[in-house]
Amino acid sequence: MLLASTTSASQLFVEMPEFYAWFRFRCDSYVRFWKAIHAAAHAARPGIDVRFNDCWIYPEMLGFDLKGMSPYFDSIRAADYVEETGDPELMVAKRGFYHAVRRAVGLDKHFVTALSQRVRATPALIKETILMSAQCGADGTTIASYDTATPALLRAVREGFAEAGIEVAAPARAG
């Protein structure tokens, strides 16, 4: 009704006020849910990082109002993994996704992205994801699916950070 049509969401809300009422209820319910989760988690363990893992390019279509929810999570991770499809045309939507997340949560919210190195990903798409993360205001990048990564994709991660001018800190040693 919406994604496959040229009709805008605004027009559907005008035509079907009950749809808007349901949608508003759903968004408000998720905000209340995250408020309760955040309060309970911080009461049980002060200093905990309550993170929202956003893997939907259009989270609002599911009723996730990131702007309304963001006071009730401490960080957000954007993980759509389109680079693992091997299709460079999907990267345009990925950039829009990252910008939308940063816009919704503001500049002060800790925001990390994710990249996947599954076999259809290419070194070029891995590098593009890393650069895009930096350009879109991410505070860091997480690496997923490294267990299935080829040596070329693992090298692309290292090279991507270097080419983007991002210094990767050595992991802290336990002890």
Regions found by a protein language model. Name each.
Residues 55-68, 88-103, 124-129:
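Alpha-helical scaffolding within the catalytic cores
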Residues 34-46, 99-109, 158-161:
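Surface-exposed amphipathic alpha-helices with a cationic face
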Residues 79-90, 107-174:
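Substrate-binding cleft of secreted/luminal carbohydrate-active enzymes
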